């Protein structure tokens, strides 16, 4: 029996009580004055007056509670033939050291850092190091074109950019440094520093007085014992800016706060994805997208899971068994990826022959999102993997599921082509053009009645007017999903 309906009703009856209870799973330096302040910001703000630190909750807290020797991060890179693991204690040390490096470069609370990196552990370390010192990271998908990167640098105005010499794709190396140099040339805003991770496959020339070598900085900090502690920030302070991937015009900088984000992600790991602390969770996405932010980095680490950072593809690295190898080797219990990945695997291995080569006995659930999950692909995955395949729907703007099938509360019947039910926090309606709710079977605009739940964007970076116009103006009192 699923407890979903009971939980959803409990949220409806007392939204503030529901989220205050969920917030007990997070460590706070100072508790909130109000769970929800309806007078703050564009539609109200969650956990107003509270103080916290996201990196502390992702790392130090687990070390202090005796989880230091558990694996926090598994880096698996078939494209470079490397694997590396970090315990919670090791990852905390690496993050504290790089946070010290950033501080020494003049990065402080509220400053922005653009991260333009491939799928390497240093990308995760840089994100968490920013969170540790209260800086705001803006991750740009590695290899994005120079003009796209330039618009983001111009909008975020970072003190520093953290990048790498290259990304690695099957059969080719993508030089990042020329793209970054061109972006800085195009941008009106010039970052003071660029920290460059030199990867063995391609060394990038460094620009004197601007570019610094990651390894040199980190080794120097370690030799001095330089580590930065966690800085207390307001729950309503930004953790990051993530630009929506619109390739035309000015991209929208989605703002994510610290407090509500942690509360919602921690709740989702147990209740939606059905995983427990200590288990291995794998989101086969990229840190440049929202799935990478929420479910490679923050969600699993907040929950005390082991997260997998995979630098490879569903097929061709080396074959259509790549995903099954990772699941088998690292004892993954739940995986989250895009339907496209499974369409590629199904095309290469329609009979699922590769699946038979691996022990997937510990694997429990597959989650799909990011685009439409066509019923054929879902059925194929169900049939071949013999586990529930859960389609769910959300947005960069929300940071976690709007609709899904909450495994941790007990599975609801799966209906192919449907993301099942709204999560607690989302009062979802289909509206006609006059803002009237439509009955089942009618087509209209999907809208969420305000206020949005914790983790959802409070506004756009430096652009409240555009936020109101894009999301709140079409149907007064509602957030328009545009889906």
Kindly label every feature range from the protein language model:
Residues 305, 333-337, 346-413, 427, ...:
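Gly/Ser/Thr-rich phosphate-binding loop
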Residues 429-450:
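Conserved beta-loop-beta connector loops within the AMP-binding
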Residues 55-56, 73-128, 145, 149-150, ...:
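Conserved AMP-binding/adenylate-forming core of the ANL superfamily
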Residues 244, 447-483:
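Conserved ATP-binding/catalytic segment of the ANL
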Residues 69-71, 194-197, 207-243, 250, ...:
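Conserved pre-ATP/AMP-binding loop-to-beta segment of ANL
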Residues 1-86, 90-93, 97-100, 184, ...:
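N-lobe entry segment of adenylate-forming
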């Amino acid at each position: 029996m699923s407890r979903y309906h009971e939980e959803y009703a409990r949220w409806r009856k007392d939204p503030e009580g529901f989220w205050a209870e969920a917030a007990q799973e997070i460590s706070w330096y100072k508790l909130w004055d109000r769970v929800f302040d309806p007078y703050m910001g564009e539609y109200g703000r969650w956990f107003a007056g509270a103080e916290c630190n996201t990196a502390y909750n992702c790392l130090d807290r687990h070390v202090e509670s005796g989880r230091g020797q558990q694996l926090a991060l598994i880096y698996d890179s078939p494209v470079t033939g490397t694997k590396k693991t970090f315990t919670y204690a090791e990852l905390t040390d690496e993050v504290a050291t790089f946070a010290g490096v950033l501080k020494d470069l003049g990065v402080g609370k509220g400053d922005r850092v653009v991260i333009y990196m491939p799928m390497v552990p240093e990308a995760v370390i840089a994100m968490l190091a920013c969170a540790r010192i209260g800086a705001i990271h803006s991750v740009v998908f590695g290899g994005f074109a120079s003009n796209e990167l330039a618009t983001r640098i111009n909008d975020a105005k970072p003190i520093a950019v953290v990048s790498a010499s290259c990304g690695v794709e099957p059969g080719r190396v993508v030089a990042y440094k020329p793209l970054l140099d061109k972006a800085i040339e195009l941008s009106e805003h010039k970052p003071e520093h660029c920290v460059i991770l030199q990867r063995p496959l391609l060394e990038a020339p460094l620009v004197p007085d601007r570019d610094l070598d990651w390894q040199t900085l980190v080794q120097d900090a370690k030799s001095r014992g330089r580590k930065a502690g966690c800085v207390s920030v307001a729950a309503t302070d930004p953790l990051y800016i993530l630009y929506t991937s619109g390739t035309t015009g000015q991209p929208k900088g989605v703002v994510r706060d610290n407090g509500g984000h942690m509360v919602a992600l921690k709740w989702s790991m147990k209740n939606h994805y059905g995983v427990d602390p200590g288990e291995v969770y794998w989101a086969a996405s990229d840190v440049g997208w929202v799935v990478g932010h929420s479910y490679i980095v923050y969600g699993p680490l907040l929950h005390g899971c082991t997260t997998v950072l995979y630098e490879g593809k569903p097929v061709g690295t080396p074959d259509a068994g790549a995903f099954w190898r990772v699941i088998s080797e690292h004892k993954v219990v739940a995986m989250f990826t895009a339907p496209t990945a499974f369409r590629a695997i199904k095309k290469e291995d329609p009979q699922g022959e590769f699946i038979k080569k691996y022990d997937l006995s510990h694997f429990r659930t597959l989650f799909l999102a990011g685009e439409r999950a066509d019923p054929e692909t879902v059925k194929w995955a169900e049939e071949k993997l013999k586990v529930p395949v859960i389609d769910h729907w959300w947005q960069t703007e929300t940071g976690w599921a709007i609709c899904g099938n909450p495994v941790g509360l007990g599975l609801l019947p799966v209906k192919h082509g449907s993301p099942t039910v709204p999560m607690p926090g989302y009062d979802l309606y289909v509206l006609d053009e006059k803002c009237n709710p439509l009955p089942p079977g009618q087509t209209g605009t999907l809208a969420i009645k305000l206020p949005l739940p914790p983790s959802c964007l409070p506004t756009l970076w430096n652009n409240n007017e555009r936020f109101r116009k894009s999301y709140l103006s079409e149907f007064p009192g509602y957030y328009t999903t545009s889906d």
